[in-house]
Amino acid sequence: MVDPPDYIVIERFPDDEPFWDDRSPDSILRARLPHLASREAYLVAAGRNNVNLAAPGTHFLAFVSPVPIPPTWSFWSIKTDSLEEARLLALWWNSTFHLAQLMENQTEVGGTWLGWLRATLHRLLVLNPKALSPELKRELLETYEAWKSVPFPSLLDQLRNHFEGRFAIDRSVAKALGSSLGDLGIPALYDRLAARIEALRDVMGRD
């Protein structure tokens, strides 16, 4: 993410009383600023307040900001030691390996609307950037650079059509895991996950 899609108010501005709709805007700011600072991170992940896996606007489950940002309540703030580490973890978070385990451990809200509790996320397997060799890190970061500005279709269409960008991410992650796409049965996994998302959508009606 390069251009911010929204703004957070962190100080007073002229004639701002209607905006706050409160008798003590300064008190709101005093309480809000430490909280915002505590949630700042390079890596932000969907699913804290549910995400629709079948929605046309759902392309990724995590994104990276070049500067730490405090996300809204809809997102998890994933703390990392550096921007590079955030990029490596973003590849994992948007990989099909992670999507599969997320779908197996979701809190289902209805149909394809899913979310994940903090305790659940702490139990899941995660790629450890600190355990990667310099060569594997370099290859993963090259994949990130190659695809970071490329528009991706919806998550469901990525799976249905075996989108090359998803293949590229999964190929790099598979190599970091010491395997390959064929060994891990990734093409078939795409089809299974797409069918499952479509089934969830159709059971509850098209969201």
Stretch-by-stretch model annotation:
Residues M1-E142, A146:
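Polybasic, glycine- and aromatic-enriched phosphate-binding surface used to engage nucleic acids
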Residues N128-D207:
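Non-catalytic DNA-recognition/assembly elements of restriction-modification systems
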